[in-house]
């Protein structure tokens, strides 16, 4: 039994779980026999595949595409997602396709994998172990976990969980950034149970004692229900003393399979944990565990098997990479200016490069030699992760933790027309159903009370009214804060009251879709912009960007507004790149006076870099800040004008406090983030919530509310219009009109909120499968061309997408519109036409021209683009092929349910997409084409909808193949002719001083012409070359000149050699070119080099040319000619037919003499305007095919028509008196 061999390849510990699967799949051997019966020669398989393909469908051969041998394979097999060539599986492709479909129908993904295993074991037994490891074992392990989950819960894994499982079994470490309710903790508990049963040691790290208990119970429940043998140890602060002691003893001795603790245990016991040799580390809610310090990252890595010195080396490497890019940019700036410091910076850059190489080699050796644990970081938000310390994880484990998005919103916003007061808040809380409330007090409210004081008063008032409320602010002890949040999550606390601070723990860090139902704002969230800024304000990039953004909205002058918004936008981009960039910028401008800083706005970045002794990269940012300060100072120089503009704007208010004046603007970001706590993404979609904003009938407050509504509508749009309660709002003078929401409508909205929370509860309790919600049911891989586009697409759905560093590229991950989305880029074309075999890389198979492609690459030395070779044919350098990138894309494809090819929506993009499709290899995923015409949230969302998915457009692909073949057959052939005809002559005279008189003489064969002669200069020169005049003296070309600039003197000449006297592209004859030179009258021996100009190109064949070719081909097919060759000596005429059984008319053999041949030859050589004497024309002077003009004979109009329509052979037949047709 072939499947018995598969069982032998299963890693120890898992075999008892695999055997039932193999027993269920025993019928696959019968299916395999059906395929084996169609065995035939590989060439016959390919011929059949090509011959049976519709003529309208593109067909090609792709080199380096077989997943087994790495050889070439036909697109017929590759686009059938088989991925194995005809030599490795010499069976009928159509039968194989049908049987694979049947195997999947019977046994799912694992059925396909095992069927392929049986066939590979039969035909390619030497490669079966590699095939099992890469393709079969991931599916088998996923099936194991799936069946365990089914036995324990009655549910099967859903798509994202299958992706995580496949990724884990392949030995990857990775991060999971997925919404609450998508089953991260369930999946982690499940794989922990399976790994523990197989004898692998697992460490499950969680942030709280509550989660320790939950995970412990879940793992033990899985083990009990699925009959797994798993020894679980949990440790937390709430355990009895004796239980703690026993747990510590078992941990110290390693007497467990799965260990579950909080992060506090990790902090205090890391030395004990790093001795235990874990196989898998699961970090649940990673942002909570590493919040506030990166040292927990180091501790996790130590437990994974790394030494602290190695972790520090990884951190040093991440720091050096940033330093490298900074130095590189600075060096370019110094070199451009000719600054003498360039050599010092260049030496430092070399030192940094050397250290980077050493550290990369060290870490590569560590990862190869050390048996490190796999690490999985899980998070619903990821927002609080300290990215600088996590750079260590990127260097060691090739992935990054991302951050979730805040753009998803399903909220009804309601303006409550009432003076903010505890009583007003209580009324709204009761109207909203009490439980699940978040009350936010904005900062800088009118009055003397601070926001923190109001928070405490509100909480106290609600508690005295019978509503369980807790206050949370910066002064709340961490334990009380955690207790309040846990109580809110469990339903013991009704309401949380907090400050609406953009960085508050409730505003940014609360992700409880099952608990948070509604939000109440104790006034409109706002920011204040000082209209009389201090010097330290103007040197703060955040203040300048914020002030410019808000003041720009007040301006009616479109050009001025656009200018301010442009500067503010550039500053925001700098700020968002990271704290360290802002710190460097502030450090650079700190010593400068404001006047000096503003003067830098008009200076060149290179001058700024020299003045401040910084790199050009930072100098550009300093210039941007200086420009912002100048614009802001100019605008704030007239406070009365600013106040007048604010009055006209109707969306902001001016607030005066003593001698200080402030501009109050709505804080949209804080409002969106805070209200977003009641509308969270989970496995069933986005929860519905309510947001109430208390606002008094005061014009200044209403202006701020109006600004909030308008900016929110402009920035995000809204599915629901703002409403007002308990009455309508009509302020036409400021453009604010809101429709009243009735008590009945409000009650209906509250019911909708409750229904949504019940659905969340069922998903979290396992009573409702994620698939039953219709959302997040599938994992998708989107393939685009540009890396920037890939990053932008993922960023549309996530603040900071998770990143996986691939071999040759980067993949980005995010939850997007019901899909677990991974985006990767091809970085342009991945394949191109080879030069051989066939006719310039085009084969003839079964009466069809079939192009052959191979993987593209680029020479690391000369930059030459190379196809299918690891050695550059131009310079012999090493070629960096795209094979590693394609292998990585194959790995990603093996994890996905659906693959979306999102290359550019044109013929070239279609062809790139088709090439990638062919290189996907063997995959169980469905492959579709999707298009988008704008990289916006709306554009990508449309492309991700299933109704937008389609097949690759065969017509577009065929059009691009035709264009490329035409380029090769015509353009490439013409280019080779150019290489034969044009030669490059280089004459080096060596180092010469300025003022030297030079004479150069060229003696070249007759018929060779010098079409260009010039002096070339080195790369550092601003002028790369200068034309030099040649004179003809007898048989020689002569140059006489005095050089004004000394240095290395080199001349180059372009020679036109139509008769190829100097050789061709395959070799030249330099001895035929004689060069004599003298300097200041003294002969010198120049260094002379002659070579074909192989860098010349005839260019691409454009569409009109293709049209002409198609028209001529059609005429050729529709025109019948006799094909023959005439050999004439003397009186004997021999006709040799080039087609069988050609019947040659007797008249032709009688009249085709030497004179006729001479006439025809001259017309063939000179064309229809060829002229003849009367003697040359002979007996044809009287025919209608010739006419006489000025004593000479040439073809008549009738003769020209014959020549044009029937060619020279047709004219020959007419001259012989025989019909040309």
From Swiss-Prot:
Q: Where are the zinc fingers (RG C-terminal-type)?
A: 856-882
Binding of Zn(2+) 2 occurs at 859, 862, 872, 875
Q: Residues in domain Helicase C-terminal? A: 424-600
The EC category is isomerase
| Cofactors that this protein relies on | Zn(2+); Mg(2+)
Q: Does the keyword Metal-binding apply?
A: yes
| Residue ranges of every copy of the Topo IA-type catalytic domain listed in the record | 953-1221
Quote a single Gene Ontology cellular component term: cytoplasm
Q: What is known of its domains?
A: Introduction of positive supercoils requires the cooperation of both the helicase-like and topoisomerase domains of the 2 subunits. The helicase-like domain probably does not directly unwind DNA, but more likely acts by driving ATP-dependent conformational changes within the whole enzyme.
This protein's name: Reverse gyrase subunit B
What is the organism of origin for this protein?
A: Methanopyrus kandleri (strain AV19 / DSM 6324 / JCM 9639 / NBRC 100938)
